[in-house]
Amino acid sequence: MKEKGRKVIATNRKARHNYTILDVYEAGIALVGTEVKSLREGKASLVDAFATVDDGEVWLRSLHIPEYTQGTWTNHAPRRTRKLLLHKQEIEHLVGKTREGNQTLVPLSMYFSDGKVKVELALAKGKQDYDKRQDLARRTAEREVTRELGRRVKGMR
């Protein structure tokens, strides 16, 4: 029986810190059997992964899926380039945006959706150090405001 819902395999936690997310896409991914088995064990790393558009196809590079422990000589290469499956209009949109410059394709997460592996791919723009500091200061200020409001509601002040 196929599993329903969404089971997250891996997330790229630094992506939202290092990039400003402009647009998000859901893409399928072409895998071999031992890769899927390794992903079912929850083993994958999106840390250095990025996507490129070559000849009208989107490729995910530097994604690390370790070899399946029970695999034999049929095992896969852990860091091989994998094809992402998107609609033609989405690919054309991504080609236009990435050619403008300063924009890149970054995987945010990888998950099972109804038994199929999907990648949440983001069109993103790199952040400068001062942008990261501004975001940190803004989040800290918001946290202080919500904490103070919570105290006032509870009658602590």
Curated annotation (Swiss-Prot):
Pfam families per UniProt: SmpB
Keywords: Cytoplasm, RNA-binding
Compartments, as annotated in UniProt: Cytoplasm
Main localisation: cytoplasm
GO molecular function list: RNA binding
GO cellular component terms, A-Z: cytosol
Highest taxon above the source species: Bacteria
Protein's GO biological process: trans-translation
InterPro entries referenced in this protein's UniProt entry, alphabetically: SmpB, SsrA-bd_prot, SsrA-bd_prot_CS
Transmembrane segments: none
Signal sequence range: none
Function: Required for rescue of stalled ribosomes mediated by trans-translation. Binds to transfer-messenger RNA (tmRNA), required for stable association of tmRNA with ribosomes. tmRNA and SmpB together mimic tRNA shape, replacing the anticodon stem-loop with SmpB. tmRNA is encoded by the ssrA gene; the 2 termini fold to resemble tRNA(Ala) and it encodes a 'tag peptide', a short internal open reading frame. During trans-translation Ala-aminoacylated tmRNA acts like a tRNA, entering the A-site of stalled ribosomes, displacing the stalled mRNA.
Stated family: Belongs to the SmpB family.
UniProt-recorded name of the protein: SsrA-binding protein
Species per Swiss-Prot/TrEMBL record: Rhodococcus jostii (strain RHA1)
